[in-house]
Amino acid sequence: MLLAVLLAPALQPDAFAAPLDYTEADVRDVRGIYDDSLDGGRGLAESATPPFSSELAIKVAGPKKQLLLSFTNRIRVDFAFTWVAHIRALGLTNFLVGATDDVAVEELTTGKVPCFSMKTNLPQGEWPWGSSSFKALGPHKIELIYKSIQWGLEVVITDIDALVLRDPFPYMARYPDAGFLTTSDHLGNTTADDGLEDHRGIHSAFNIGYMFFRPSAIPLVEEWRRYINEDPRNRWDQGEFNRIARSKWKPGRTDGLSDKRLFWAYQEKVIGGVLPIALFAGGHNYFVSQLAQRMGVPPYSIHTTFQYSAAAGKRHRLREAMVWIDEPSYYDPPGGLLVYAPDVPKALVYPPKGMTTNGHIALIKHQLRQIRSALALAQALGRKLILPEVTCGYDKAWFQL
């Protein structure tokens, strides 16, 4: 087997390539997170970190009363730095990051990230999906939403692994009567334009990892808040939001709505909509189906859902898409880099009788042998191997496609 190898010079810190098929113009320079001048004049490192308050939220939201929110614990602070870097690259200042523990407070403050202390008793380690600690985060998140809209703000709230790559508020303004707009776990887009998903796509699970709320959603959020707070360690915020939002809803009723893709939710008291899954992308739609790339439109957000290997897997996916922010030293290892051009025969990718389980295994094994050889060569040369994109015959999934 012939392995074509290129000994790569160290990448420069500004060597940000466009993700997948995008042009360089579509990708923002997000290196500013390492610039100490990006304090915004707030003196954050010198002052005590405040709690989430109306004074803080309204001041940061500014005259448009629009606020971007996320939150993190100590082991996801690097996600927060990446989240903030992309927002700063957009020229936005109307954002805050909540810290759920004292270590996160210290690191965010030292990193000059506008933040507030959530003062929770949540575990400082991983929050495994479905665990009691994972569910216990829900009331804190809902409280941020509830307070924000009670104070008269429009709010986009995201998980810390849901990156904000374009200013979302001009998009939300297209639907002025919507009380909430939510992302979705739907895996097939129902429209070919950049509008909301139509009513064929609103029955899949709403994903609350990236959501928009207006004060008109207060009736829904109040009920959501009340129900979760009754049993906060056992009731899942996303599951209950889906149930409550669909309580006595009328998805087929469109009278009086600014757009026929909106719908009446929660006892016909609140208007909702599903954001386009190509532009407000979950992990499968962005990294696997690549809907945004095929449309040729840069997404508003990428949320690393449907990924394996917990935080490490999420970091890898975001690095692969060239949207993860590393310190400049990451691109300049002492011994240099090693890249190679993988050999992926067309006959293995498109077997004459179609892909089979054995065909998929043969395709993967062919590529793993090359990776093994490249790893051995990199170790012998003292270089870091840049892993190639691996072509798969089948998609690994635990969910129904």
Go through each PLM region and give its residues:
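N-terminal targeting/anchoring "stem" of glycan-biosynthesis enzymes
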Residues: 15, 294-297, 301-401
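N-proximal low-complexity "stem/linker" segments adjacent to membrane-targeting elements
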Residues: 22-78
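Short, acidic, metal-binding catalytic loop of nucleotide-sugar glycosyltransferases
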Residues: 86-94
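Active-site-proximal specificity loops/subdomain of glycosyltransferases
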Residues: 103-151
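Short beta-strand-to-loop acidic/aromatic patch adjacent to the donor-nucleotide binding site
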Residues: 145, 152-161
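Conserved donor-nucleotide/metal-binding helix-loop-beta segment in metal-dependent transferases, i.e.
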Residues: 162-203
